[in-house]
């Protein structure tokens, strides 16, 4: 099952990269693979080829993309992503409380983590150009970060840093979070934030 946003342009060979990676995975395993987003602002791969479809410079993108080096990484850029349909069904897909979409990707990933998935791998050569949530801008934004915090007791940032090790170079299956000073300090901040939103900010 391939998941993607409706404001993404899929770059050449994206599907071949996914397919080749699948050949290296054990049959019937649960996993989460993601591609790499190219965006017109400072982020993962920064290359400004237009912020709207009317401004889109496809020629510039296709000319410059092969020259940009990027490593496979831990965690995920959320979408585009590839997962087994059986894995999607095990966790019930996206959670409706995050509609219209903000926060749904990290929530989905945390459900996969709780299922036991430990292969969260970002593929550097599976690339999409992302115009950055044009569809969501037309809708009311939900507070996905707050919803995630109240649901799981952790922030999205904490999950990405200590669980997914997001944006670190890929070096194999993820392990349980390293419970060092940074972990407990960030966890304490999470608990204060949870208490505030759960009990104080509700009045």
What label would you give each PLM region?
Residues 18, 74-83, 87-92, 98-126:
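A short, conserved alpha-helix in the catalytic core of glycosyltransferases
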Residues 38, 99, 121-139, 147:
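Active-site donor/metal-binding and catalytic loop motifs
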Residues 13-32:
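Conserved donor-nucleotide/metal-binding helix-loop-beta segment in metal-dependent transferases, i.e.
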Residues 50-74, 78:
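Short, flexible, basic/aromatic active-site loop/helix in glycosyltransferases
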Residues 140-143, 150, 162-203:
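Non-catalytic, C-terminal membrane-associated alpha-helical segments of glycosyltransferases
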Residues 1-11:
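Short beta-strand-to-loop acidic/aromatic patch adjacent to the donor-nucleotide binding site
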């Amino acid at each position: 099952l391939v998941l993607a946003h409706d404001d993404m342009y899929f770059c050449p060979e994206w599907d071949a990269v996914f397919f080749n990676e699948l050949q290296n995975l054990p049959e019937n395993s649960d996993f989460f693979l993601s591609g790499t987003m190219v965006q017109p602002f400072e982020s993962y791969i920064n290359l400004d080829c237009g912020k709207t479809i009317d401004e889109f410079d496809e020629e510039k993108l296709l000319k410059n993309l092969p020259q940009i080096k990027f490593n496979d990484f831990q965690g995920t850029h959320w979408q585009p992503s590839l997962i087994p349909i059986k894995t999607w069904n095990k966790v019930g897909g996206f959670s409706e409380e995050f509609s219209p979409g903000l926060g749904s990707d990290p929530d989905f990933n945390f459900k996969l983590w709780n299922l036991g998935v430990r292969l969260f791998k970002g593929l550097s050569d599976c690339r999409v150009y992302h115009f950055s949530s044009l569809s969501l801008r037309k809708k009311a934004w939900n507070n996905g970060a707050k919803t995630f915090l109240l649901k799981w007791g952790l922030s999205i940032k904490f999950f990405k840093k200590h669980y997914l090790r997001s944006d670190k170079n890929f070096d194999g299956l993820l392990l349980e979070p390293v419970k060092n000073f940074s972990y407990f300090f960030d966890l304490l901040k999470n608990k204060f934030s949870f208490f505030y939103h759960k009990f104080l900010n509700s009045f």
